[in-house]
Amino acid sequence: MTDMWSLKICACLGLLLLFKPIDSMGWQGPKVDCTANGTQTECPVACPETCEYSGNGPCVKMCGAPCVCKPGYVINERIPACVLRSDCPKDVVRKEDMLLGVSNFKCFSRNYNCS
């Protein structure tokens, strides 16, 4: 089990990676390619629905990756991109919740190196 300090440190590091200063007046998320079926948003949930996870389980209270899928689409973490639920890999077993899902979505943008 992760202690509270580790969780807070992880949350701060995640936000620093997602946002960069634009000037002394505020912050702005980086420009990202959210693929054809996704869109950029300021603070999406950290545990969205994916091919593997329902998105209904408990989740950390912080911003997730900068992209969200359009209605009817879910994240396929293998690509990563938004796909129709029916286009998810057939070998994926759906689960109700994910543990610290934020780190699972760091690659959901072509601006991140995920190799």
Curated annotation (Swiss-Prot):
Pfam families linked: TIL (PF01826)
Gene Ontology terms, MF aspect: serine-type endopeptidase inhibitor activity
Main localisation: secreted
Tissues where the protein occurs: Produced in the male genital tract (at protein level). Present in seminal fluid. Transferred to the female genital tract within the first 3 minutes after the start of mating (ASM) and crosses the posterior vaginal wall into the female hemolymph 5 minutes ASM (at protein level).
GO BP term, pick one: sperm competition
GO CC terms of this entry: extracellular space
InterPro entries per the UniProt record, alphabetical: Ser_inhib-like_sf, TIL_dom
Record localization: Secreted
Function description: Responsible for physiological and behavioral changes in mated female flies. May contribute to the toxicity of seminal fluid and the decreased life-span of mated females. May also affect neuromuscular events after mating concerning sperm storage and egg release.
Protein name stated in the entry: Accessory gland protein Acp62F
Organism, scientific name: Drosophila melanogaster (Fruit fly)
Organism phylogeny: Eukaryota, Metazoa, Ecdysozoa, Arthropoda, Hexapoda
